[in-house]
Amino acid sequence: MKADQVAALKKSFEQIETVGQQAGHYFYNSLLERNPSFKAMFTGDMDLQVEKFLSTLKLMVHSFESSKNGEYHLSADLRLPLKNLGKKHQELGVNSEMYKPVAEALVGSLEKFSGDAFTPELRKAWTDAYWEIADAMKTHQ
């Protein structure tokens, strides 16, 4: 990712944070409506799940570091926790094919709550960030 993409993610997340609970519930409702088989994985308190989701999203946008070539990548310090998170997700029944519907629900939710600010460039930044996180989570497999 480039510096302008990381800056755009941070600015976008600030906007999303103002409607965090609403956006988080929209994300999960969208995900579960499109993928009913996922519902069995979400048996707990959805308000708590939304809080975890928003915390993870915030951590994500603030965890990209510049490398020598000017590209931004996930902080090396975050890779092991993400690997462990991926392992926990796998133990809950998440497989590699499930990451794509999550990406679609995430980007769709971000678009809904960003309005006109959700440009094609911002879509690409969020998509790239998501897949870097997802790929780190899948390294345990």
Predicted features and spans:
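Globin-like tetrapyrrole-binding proteins
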Residues: 1-141
